[in-house]
Structures are given as structure tokens and as C-alpha cells.
């Protein structure tokens, strides 16, 4: 009867009997619980590309080094000599060690090495503030320019142009921004590789750099983040790079000329002052020393002579007469007393 009932089409009445006759294998009892399968440090919600990108980000120091370091590979940079014309979009000053460029304009920078770096080496660009009171802050674009940008890296100041292999990073500890591009060997007949950088915010933007000077650090690194070379230069993003470069170089020359003139025109120490102070320390010697005074005009000479004769007479008569003559306390009091007596 039970077998006949089971052959009938399934319905709510036959489901209970079917469930009770299901054979459960004892082998399933030895399997681990479902929770055990998820406790093996596996995150199924993590994007594999994101995991790989985070893995390649080296731990950045709190304060990046800004000293130039050529390293074993002779890492160096070369800038185009664009001059100081008003029409240039970027120009580099060797005197100042400073790059002047326009907003969002491409700036070519040559990368030179004496010895080829390891396979997979990258060039990393990072921006930091120059002054010590601002070096702890992250260099970002101003809110105005960020709002006009729809890209994923809209807050990054430095962009790499002309390469689809550029990667943008944000350090998880310091929050500093950086961008990397793979190092490419120089083409045949060339000694250097050129990378194209653009700066996406003006130096004067409120809420961004806010007229605070910045430094750009270019490092040659391995895939593990080991620094093979480092170069640093100051950057000013402005509307007229040629004009600003010419102005700052002129100010540098003027300040250097002023310092030279000050050193040349420094007055020599006055020896007469030293002699006077030395002689003033010995009052008794001054009274006995004889001085010669040149006087213009006979009448004036006779007046000074009579004055001198009177003083000589006082010295001969003794100190008693000097004590009888009271010394005036001050000139103002004498005048005031005279007016009262009148």
C-alpha cells in the first residue's frame, strides 16, 4: 500500500511520507560544518584586482625623503629648455630648481639611467608640501576642480598622460597620493625615456595648495617598492610660467647682489670710539692731560681763553671754592626758579 502511494503524483499529502523514507548516508556526517568552509581567511566579497593593487602599494614613510639620490643606476631627470616667453606652457629654472607650468598642461620630463633597472621597475610621482609646517598634510586638488572632474582619481594632483598603464594609489596609513608608470627602455638612438606629467590644480587655489609651495618627488622603484633612485624639484602651477620664472630669477639675482653690497660696504670698527672709552675709564689721567683746541676767530679765542684762565685759577686756589659753588640740579628747575623770583 505504501509503495502504491509513493507512485502517485507528488502532492502535499504524499510529501510527508516521502520525506520520512529519504535515506541519509552516514558519510555526510563526517563532513565539516558549513561554517568551517568560510573560516579559512577567504573573503568572497574582495575584488581580485583590488587585492592585487593593494598588495603592490609599498608602505610609505610618514615624511618622504626629498634629497636627491642617483643610486647604483644613475637615476637622473632632464627638462626641456623652454625659455621665459609668455607663450610657453611649462618651463624649468635650473637656478631655482623649480618647474613652472600651467594647469592641466602636459609637461615632458626625461628620465635617464646609466644602468638599466630590474625588470618591472616603475617610476612613482608624489607631491609633498615644501615647508615643515605643512609637510604633514596631503597635497590634494581644491574642491572646485574636483567637482568638475568625473574620473576615479579626481582628488590626485599629479596625472600621467599618454599611458594606459598608469596606476594611482593612496597610501592606507598616510593618505598620500602617488601615481606610477612602468619604466620603459630608451628607444633606439635615444639616451632617455620621456614621461608626461600634468598638474591638475593651481598653486593659488583656495582649499587646495593655497599658495603653499610644493615639491614633486620622482622615484625609481622595483615592483616590491624598493627605491633605486630619487629626484626632487619644486613646482609652481600658474597662468603664465614664463613670466613667473623670469620674476623669481630676477628676485634671486637682486637678493644676491644686495647681500654682496652689504658685505663690501660694512663699516670698519671705529678706533676713536675705543680710544675714548678707554681714556674715559681713567678720570684722573684726563685731568692732567693737555689738549690742543683750534678756534676760528680772535674774539672767540679770547672768550675761551678767559674761560680757561678762570678754570686754571680755580684749580690753583683749591677744592674749597669748588664746594662753595652749588652745582645746578637741572636746567629746567633753574629756569623755573628764575621765573618765580621775577
UniProtKB/Swiss-Prot annotation:
Subcellular localization, as worded in the UniProt entry: Cytoplasm; Nucleus
UniProt-annotated site: Interaction with DNA, residues: 86
Region (Transcription activation (acidic)): 1-35
Chief subcellular location: cytoplasm
Residue ranges of the region described as Interaction with DNA: 236-243
Positions of region (Oligomerization): 288-317
GO CC terms: cytoplasm; mitochondrion; nucleus
Motif Nuclear export signal: positions: 302-313
Region entry Basic (repression of DNA-binding), spans: 319-336
InterPro entries cross-referenced by the UniProt entry: p53-like_TF_DNA-bd_sf, p53/RUNT-type_TF_DNA-bd_sf, p53_DNA-bd, p53_tetramer_sf, p53_tetrameristn, p53_transactivation_domain, p53_tumour_suppressor
Biased composition range(s): Basic and acidic residues: 244-256
Ranges annotated as DNA-binding: 68-255
Keyword Cell cycle carried by entry: yes
UniProt binding sites for Zn(2+): 142, 145, 201, 205
Region described as Disordered: 244-287, 318-342
Cofactor (UniProt): Zn(2+)
Motif (Bipartite nuclear localization signal): 261-278
Family, as annotated: Belongs to the p53 family.
Quaternary state and interactors: Binds DNA as a homotetramer.
Free-text comment on this protein's domains from its UniProt entry: The N-terminal and C-terminal disordered regions undergo liquid-liquid phase separation (LLPS) following homotetramerization and activation. Post-translational modifications, such as phosphorylation or lactylation affect the ability to undergo LLPS.
Official protein name in the record: Cellular tumor antigen p53
Amino acid at each position: 500500500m505504501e509503495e502504491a502511494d509513493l507512485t502517485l503524483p507528488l502532492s502535499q499529502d504524499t510529501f510527508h511520507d516521502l520525506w520520512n523514507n529519504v535515506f541519509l548516508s552516514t558519510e555526510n556526517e563526517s563532513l565539516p560544518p558549513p561554517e568551517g568552509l568560510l573560516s579559512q581567511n577567504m573573503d568572497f566579497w574582495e575584488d581580485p584586482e583590488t587585492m592585487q593593487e593593494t598588495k603592490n602599494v609599498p608602505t610609505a614613510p610618514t615624511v618622504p625623503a626629498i634629497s636627491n639620490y642617483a643610486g647604483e643606476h644613475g637615476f637622473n631627470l632632464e627638462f626641456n629648455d623652454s625659455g621665459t616667453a609668455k607663450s610657453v606652457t611649462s618651463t624649468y629654472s635650473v637656478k631655482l630648481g623649480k618647474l613652472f607650468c600651467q594647469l592641466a598642461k602636459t609637461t615632458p620630463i626625461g628620465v635617464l639611467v646609466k644602468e638599466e633597472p630590474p625588470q618591472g621597475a616603475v617610476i612613482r610621482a608624489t607631491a609633498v608640501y615644501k615647508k615643515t609646517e605643512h609637510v604633514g598634510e596631503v597635497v590634494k586638488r581644491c574642491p572646485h576642480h574636483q567637482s568638475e572632474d568625473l574620473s576615479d582619481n579626481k582628488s590626485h594632483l599629479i596625472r600621467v598622460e599618454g599611458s594606459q598603464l598608469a596606476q594611482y594609489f593612496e597610501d592606507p596609513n598616510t593618505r598620500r597620493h602617488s601615481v606610477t608608470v612602468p619604466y620603459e627602455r630608451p628607444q633606439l638612438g635615444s639616451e632617455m625615456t620621456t614621461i608626461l606629467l600634468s598638474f591638475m590644480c593651481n598653486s593659488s587655489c583656495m582649499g587646495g595648495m593655497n599658495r603653499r609651495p610644493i615639491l614633486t618627488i620622482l622615484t625609481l622603484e622595483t615592483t616590491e617598492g624598493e627605491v633605486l633612485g630619487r629626484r626632487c624639484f619644486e613646482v609652481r602651477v600658474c597662468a603664465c610660467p614664463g613670466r613667473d620664472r623670469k620674476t623669481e630669477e630676477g628676485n634671486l639675482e637682486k637678493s644676491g647682489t644686495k647681500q654682496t653690497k652689504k658685505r663690501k660696504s660694512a663699516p670698519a670698527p671705529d678706533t676713536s670710539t675705543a680710544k675714548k672709552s678707554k681714556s674715559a675709564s681713567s678720570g684722573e689721567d684726563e685731568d692732567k692731560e693737555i689738549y690742543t683746541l683750534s678756534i676760528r676767530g680772535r674774539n672767540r679765542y679770547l672768550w675761551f681763553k678767559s674761560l680757561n684762565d678762570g678754570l686754571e685759577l680755580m684749580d690753583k686756589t683749591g677744592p674749597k671754592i669748588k664746594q662753595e659753588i652749588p652745582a645746578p640740579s637741572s636746567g629746567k628747575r633753574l629756569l623755573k626758579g628764575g621765573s618765580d623770583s621775577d
